[in-house]
Each structure stands twice: as structure tokens, then as C-alpha cells.
Amino acid sequence: MRPAIRIVPALLLVGVTAIWGWTFVVVKDAIASYPVVSFLGVRFVLAALVLWLIVLLLRQRGRVALAGLTIGVVLAFSYLSQTLGLKGTSVANTGLITGLFVVFTPIIDRLLWRVPSQRSTWLAAGFAFLGTALLTGGAPRGFHLGDLFVLLGSVGFALHITLLSRYAAAGPLLLAAWQMTAAGLLLTAGAVLTRSTVLPAPSSVLPALAITGILASAIAFWVQTYAQQRLPASRAALILTMEPAFTVFFAFLLAAERFRLLQAVGATLILLALFYSELRQRAAIGAAAPVLAPSTSEP
């Protein structure tokens, strides 16, 4: 794919990470008065309803139910594992371990689909993970049982990215709709089984549910699926590491939280990893392009 064409899905994915970073600030207050699993369940059910409405309006058809439901199960598992882990470990550990998805993605890509990993991919992933570590507070603060759940969630997020890149071409809208359906139903079932309050949600939480359900889930996952049909999984994972950078930025801008020097360095490392990856891919495309010898024949 030519660089000019590839930059559009990359920018769309950057936009998705910006939305997720912004909504993290919105969600923070909402889950203080509403169970996390219930919030996630209602959020994804709302997203599924919005996407199915769009599917009906656009009269979309396709045989992607199995792939979409499978990806949705992986997504629900990832969120549940991360949420369970967060209850048993620190926020810093959660952010740091979750950031390992950028390392796990090329590994899973190679194991499942035999996608070769270049040295530049690993170098960029290393820089991005180091940047994530600085953004989330540096070194882990001791080992907790919750860390294992967060680690499983990180593997799940990496698998989610690789599956999207593999099956997104089958139909981004339908795939996103089935994905939200599976995730919403499973997370809602999880909330019911844990006897968490699902409905009615507190009125103070409704704006956050609407924002995250429609914008950060229905639209964002649709756009992510569309973008990943044109991006390799390892490239998508690198771009998605920008989410904590946007979270810190919007927390500083909207919630008056302090922006520390280490966080600025971390955000810079993530950006450098993205630029390095882009330059290496452009160089690889240029080297692979055929060289046409000038014609010596007269017209």
C-alpha cells in the first residue's frame, strides 16, 4: 500500500485513541457511583443497538457473524480481566502491564498467521512500551495477584488487534456490530452474575453512558475495524499506545491534573516509536518498488 493511502487509516486510528483518552476522564467519575462491569455492559449494548440501526439503514449484508462474535468475546474477556485485575493491583501496574499488548501483538501475529516480524517492529514496540511505562508511573510497585488478570487482559487486547486486522476486510460495519453485541451481552451477564446493579443506572451516569456507548464504542470500534483492514496488526498496536498519552493530556486539560516531566518524556517516546515505524515502512516500500530502466528504443 502506498504511504499516501496508508496514512488515512493511521490518522483515523489516532483519532480513535484520542476519543478513548478523552472518555477515560469522563468514565472516571461515572464508575465512582456505578459498577464498572455494569457500565461496560450497558455501554456495549448501547453501541450494538446503534450499529445495528446503521446496518439496517445502510442495508448491509455479509457473513461475518462468527468472526464478529468471536472477536467480541475476546474483547469482553480482555475488559473483564483488566477490571478484575484493577481491583487487586495498583493503577500504575494496570497501565504498565496493559501496555504490553504492543509487544504481544507481533508475537500472536506470528504464531497464528506466520506474519514475519522485522527488527524495526520490535524496536518501535520497545520504545512504545517504555513510553507507556513512563506515562503510567514507571516501574511496577510490587507483584499482586491482580497483575496476572491484567496480564491476561493485555494478551486479550493483543489478540483482539490481530483478529481485527485479519478479518476486518470482510465488512467493518457488520463486524463491529457483531463484536459489540457479543461484548455487551457477556459483560451484562457478568454484571448480573456478580449481582451488580445494571438498570436503572443513576441519572448522573447517563451522559457518560451515552458518550462512551455511541462515540467511544459504536463509532470508535467501527472506525478501528475500518482502519485495521488497511493496517498490519503490529502497526495498529503501535498507534493504539497513544491512548495513555491522550488520557494524560485530557486529564491535564479538563481535570486540572498535573503533567509531570516523566509523562512528557513517555509521550515523546511513543511519538518517536510511531515516526520511526512509519519511516522504516516507507523505506521498505521504496526498496521493494520496481526500478524501470529507461527505454533505449526510438519512438
Describe each region flagged by the PLM:
Residues 8, 32-77, 104-108, 156-160, ...:
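Transmembrane alpha-helices of multi-pass small-molecule transport proteins
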Residues 50-59, 82, 101-123, 245-265:
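C-terminal transmembrane-helix exit sites in multi-pass transporters
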